[in-house]
């Protein structure tokens, strides 16, 4: 979830940014659903998030705080604790894992129907990650499988990405930043 804090600060990330760990919850935050997007690209070994981690970075006009939430089944129930204060969602899909698309669709539907999200016009950025993997689904196919065209009450955008190389991430963050700025006016 992403949010704008008092004083014009907000919270998102992509590889290549310098990160600081923070062990407190800011008033509003950005939930990121993939470890690859929330750690420095210079790291050699990216391991899955266990539970969650909190990271910060700045763009030219906003400061972002990212709650990197584990997508593992046993941790998904933690997501909802961060919905109220968030002002945007980044939902990361492994486009190379065709078998888990059904699970991704179910989790997306659960998220969209949560009382803290359902009636809010909150922007959603989808990262169709691992586009570098052979036989990965295109962002168009991911969009179709997740039925993204059925999302009528929230602005959304999907980007094909390769988080390890940072490809597609700036485009998505730029879109999200524009959406957050629009919400503030």
PLM features: what roles do these ranges have?
Residues 1-185:
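TRAFAC-class small GTPase G-domain
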């Amino acid at each position: 979830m992403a949010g704008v804090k008092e004083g014009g600060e907000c919270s998102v990330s992509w590889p290549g940014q310098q990160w600081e760990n923070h062990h407190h919850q800011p008033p509003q935050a950005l939930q990121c659903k993939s470890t690859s997007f929330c750690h420095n690209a210079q790291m050699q070994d990216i391991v899955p998030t266990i539970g969650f981690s909190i990271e910060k970075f700045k763009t030219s006009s906003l400061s972002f705080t990212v709650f990197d939430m584990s997508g593992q089944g046993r941790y998904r129930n933690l997501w909802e604790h961060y919905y109220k204060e968030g002002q945007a969602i980044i939902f990361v899909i492994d486009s190379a894992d065709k078998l888990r698309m059904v699970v991704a669709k179910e989790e997306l539907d659960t998220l969209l129907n949560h009382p803290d999200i359902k009636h809010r016009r909150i922007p959603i950025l989808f990262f169709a990650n691992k586009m570098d993997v052979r036989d990965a689904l295109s962002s168009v196919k991911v969009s179709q499988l997740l039925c993204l065209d059925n999302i009528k009450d929230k602005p959304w955008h999907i980007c094909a990405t390769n988080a390890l190389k940072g490809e597609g991430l700036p485009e998505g963050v730029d879109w999200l930043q524009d959406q957050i700025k629009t919400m503030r006016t």
